[in-house]
Curated annotation (Swiss-Prot):
Top-rank lineage group of the source organism: Bacteria
Needed co-factor(s): Zn(2+)
SUPFAM superfamilies: Xylose isomerase-like
Protein name (record): Probable endonuclease 4
Biological processes per GO annotation: base-excision repair
Alphabetized GO MF terms: deoxyribonuclease IV (phage-T4-induced) activity; DNA binding; DNA-(apurinic or apyrimidinic site) endonuclease activity; phosphoric diester hydrolase activity; zinc ion binding
Free-text remark on how the cofactor is bound: Binds 3 Zn(2+) ions.
Lineage of source species: Bacteria, Bacillati, Bacillota, Bacilli, Bacillales
Residue positions binding Zn(2+) 3: 181, 226, 228
Known EC number: 3.1.21.2
Residues binding Zn(2+) 1, per UniProt: 68, 109, 144
Catalytic activity: Endonucleolytic cleavage to 5'-phosphooligonucleotide end-products
Main EC class the enzyme belongs to: hydrolase
Length: 296
């Protein structure tokens, strides 16, 4: 199964270290930020250790890796021109890094309209993406399905479709389908996932989905909260998520876990990914997973 998680990329090893971390977690793919998601500090492309990273990926059988754009990008902002301009400029540079790393998709939160209304936010996102998607490369921007927290744009399939329809080079737009976000937005991810896919296909088209974020949710359906939970421990539940990751629609799509680290002590939190992947690959839920992780 083409499944992995968000892994770190830092120090001198950079991409090579990401591949090694993913391998230790028994992953077949992984997702990275090119730097801290909260700021714009980035290393030069030549310092990302890409060649050694690719060699490690080949050795460990890792493929279809994904980049995630930082949270600070908000091209839906109609109130502050400098925030919009920073977002456009930084997204262009992130696409260059994504191409150099060899990833096909960079996941982007569409943005927040900060009070101007979703229609105004969508117009601004379209403006920004039309500025960004002019340089000639193969990198796709994967718009993420959002939970609808605050003034987030992208809480419905229709909002995402509006963005896609307004962008000139929309062959370079894809979708990152997030199970937690879509559940929190009010879609029946737990109880009737095939109808959700059917609706998505009618509004956007299943061929647009190029990344799957696999997360349980701490919240009831429609809560608009966006709080991830470990696989099988939330309101979506193991059976539904297991069904989703084994669904034929996602067979060749990278499936990325973004579930929380385990442990009460903030200084001793541990990644759950190896165990969550094992549960999904064996299709068997282990209610003692968290205790097992902390006892290792």
């Amino acid at each position: 199964m083409l499944i992995g998680s968000h892994v770190s990329m830092n120090g001198k090893k950079m991409l090579q270290g990401s591949a090694e971390e993913a391998h230790r977690l028994n992953e077949k793919t992984f997702m990275i930020y090119t730097g801290a998601p909260q700021n714009t500090r980035r290393k030069a492309i030549e310092d990302l250790n890409i060649e050694a990273g690719h060699e490690a990926m080949k050795e460990y059988g890792l493929s279809n890796i994904v980049v995630h754009a930082p949270y600070i990008i908000n091209i839906a902002n109609t109130q502050k021109p400098h925030v919009f301009e920073l977002g456009v400029d930084f997204l262009q540079k992130e696409i260059e890094r994504t191409e150099a790393i060899g990833a096909k998709d960079i996941v982007l939160h569409p943005g927040s309209h900060v009070g101007a209304g979703s229609e105004a936010g969508i117009k601004k996102i379209i403006e920004g993406l039309n500025e960004v998607l002019t340089n000639d490369n193969d990198v796709r921007i994967a718009l993420e399905t959002m939970a609808g927290k605050g003034s987030e744009v992208g809480r419905t399939f229709e909002e995402l479709a509006q963005i896609i329809e307004g962008v000139n080079h929309n062959e370079r737009l894809s979708i990152c389908f997030d199970t937690c976000h879509t559940h929190d937005a009010g879609y029946k991810v737990k109880d009737d996932f095939d109808s959700v896919l059917e609706e998505f296909d009618n509004v956007i088209g299943l061929d647009r989905i190029k990344v799957l974020h696999v997360n349980d949710s701490k919240n009831e359906i429609g809560a608009h909260k966006d709080r991830h939970e470990n696989i099988g421990f939330g309101h979506i539940g193991f059976d539904a998520l297991n069904y989703i990751v084994h669904h034929e629609v996602f067979e060749n799509i990278p499936k990325i876990l973004e579930t929380p680290f385990v442990g009460e002590d903030k200084k001793n939190k541990r990644p759950p990914y190896k165990h969550e992947i094992e549960m999904l690959e064996t299709e068997t839920f282990n209610p003692n997973m968290k205790e097992i992780i902390m006892s290792e």
